[in-house]
């Protein structure tokens, strides 16, 4: 039985990276994809001294003695709006009406807000002094030309897309989405639209796994149920491995008479690297390769399949796309109540993270075991209990893996 770290190392060592797996897409189609190129600023940002608000562009030296009772009186010599430039120079005793986002005219070193200004018949009365640079965003303060803006390996979020657009990236190189098939094994499974008969349950793992895989960037080709039949299991694996980069199965990976995934893989000639992992839940996790196709055999219980996916399959899918960060973030929080461990296996228990009195606390969810999909829906973290601990008492600091 492998330690989690050893199992993950084996999986990633046999998972291809994004080399020779890139494609160019439009920026509009890039959201959620993994960027495979460093992007540098092609200009200063802003590319000019920019007004932060509506008002008047002025020389601060002209307003040093301005008060409501003795306002400075300046001559209005023009107007400049966003998207236009003022073709002139502001001299002593002059001002230009300016709008938010417009370039500050030459000669001006401040923008005075409209609220302290009276303007009439070409005369601008300003009731307060200004400081040099007031209400101006200087050229290049956000980014200098040539600066690295977005690194290769980053996820293109809406915020990153805005940066890419700012610096002219109409097309971007991204990692190819791995194609993936989900197979849920078990004669007890029925489709979601069917009413289960005695001893049957609806197939929920297909939908959670397909959703997790899509969230990790995979292109899910198909999903379905495979009965507990050796020939059917072998045929389903062979057929899907021929069309997909990844085949992900749930169930059929333990030691029972109807756990047929490993025997089917062996007869197909797959190379099995991981068979059991010292973790709870998720111990009977399998990883293999059939040709160049990755095969993940995950446990059948919904919570077990979710934990195993996030610890093993998600990092592999992200590595295939060239992601720099492939693991879920970890933080520490104080246990709000006692947390049980499962030595000699590492435990991952669903919990809820909250902030109380300025500190992070995590509450273990009350759940009925690894089949309790209803409780797991409420979880936003996994509470990690090491292999050598029986648990934690309330108030102790624990490690948690963020799921959201």
Role assignments for model-derived ranges:
Residues 1-8, 170-298, 302-308:
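Helix-rich terminal scaffold detector
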Residues 1-65, 70:
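Intrinsically disordered, low-complexity, positively charged segments
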Residues 2, 23-28, 37, 83, ...:
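Flexible glycine/proline-rich
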Residues 2, 56-222, 227, 361-362, ...:
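Short, glycine/charged-enriched hinge/interface segments at domain edges or termini
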Residues 2-6, 22-29, 53, 71, ...:
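Conserved active-site and cofactor/substrate-binding residues in soluble primary-metabolism enzymes
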């Amino acid at each position: 039985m492998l330690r989690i770290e050893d199992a993950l190392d084996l999986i990633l060592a046999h998972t291809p990276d994004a080399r020779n797996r890139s494609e160019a897409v439009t920026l509009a189609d890039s959201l959620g994809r993994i960027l495979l190129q460093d992007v540098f600023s092609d200009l200063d940002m802003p590319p000019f001294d920019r007004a932060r608000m509506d008002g008047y562009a002025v020389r601060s030296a002209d307003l040093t003695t301005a008060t409501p009772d003795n306002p400075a009186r300046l001559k209005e010599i023009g107007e400049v709006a966003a998207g236009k430039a003022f073709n002139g120079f502001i001299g002593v005793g002059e001002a230009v009406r300016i709008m938010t986002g417009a370039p500050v005219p030459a000669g001006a070193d401040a923008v005075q807000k409209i609220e302290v200004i009276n303007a009439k018949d070409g005369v601008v009365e300003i009731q307060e002094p200004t400081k040099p640079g007031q209400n101006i965003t200087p050229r290049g303060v956000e980014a200098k030309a040539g600066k690295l803006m977005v690194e290769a390996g980053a996820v293109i979020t809406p915020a990153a897309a805005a940066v890419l657009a700012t610096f002219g990236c109409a097309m971007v190189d991204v990692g190819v989405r791995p194609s993936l098939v989900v197979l849920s094994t078990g004669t007890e499974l029925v489709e979601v639209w069917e009413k289960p008969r005695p001893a049957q349950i609806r197939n929920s793992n297909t939908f959670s796994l397909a959703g997790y895989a899509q969230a990790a960037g995979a292109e899910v080709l198909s999903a379905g149920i495979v009965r507990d039949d050796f020939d059917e299991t072998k045929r389903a694996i062979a057929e899907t491995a021929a069309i997909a980069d990844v085949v992900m199965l749930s169930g059929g990976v333990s030691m029972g008479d109807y756990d047929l995934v490993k025997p089917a893989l062996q007869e197909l000639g797959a190379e099995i690297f991981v068979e059991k992992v010292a973790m709870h839940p998720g111990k009977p996790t399998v990883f293999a390769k059939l040709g160049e196709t990755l095969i993940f055999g995950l446990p059948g219980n919904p919570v077990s399949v979710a934990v195993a996916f996030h610890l093993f399959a998600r990092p592999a899918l992200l590595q295939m796309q060239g992601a720099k960060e492939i693991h879920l973030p970890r933080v520490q929080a104080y246990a709000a109540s006692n947390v049980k461990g499962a030595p000699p296996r590492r435990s991952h228990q669903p919990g809820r993270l909250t902030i109380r009195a300025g500190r992070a606390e995590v509450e273990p969810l009350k759940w009925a075991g690894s089949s309790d999909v209803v409780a797991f829906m409420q979880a936003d973290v996994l509470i990690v209990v090491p292999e050598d601990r029986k648990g934690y008492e309330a108030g102790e600091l624990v490690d948690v893996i963020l799921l959201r």
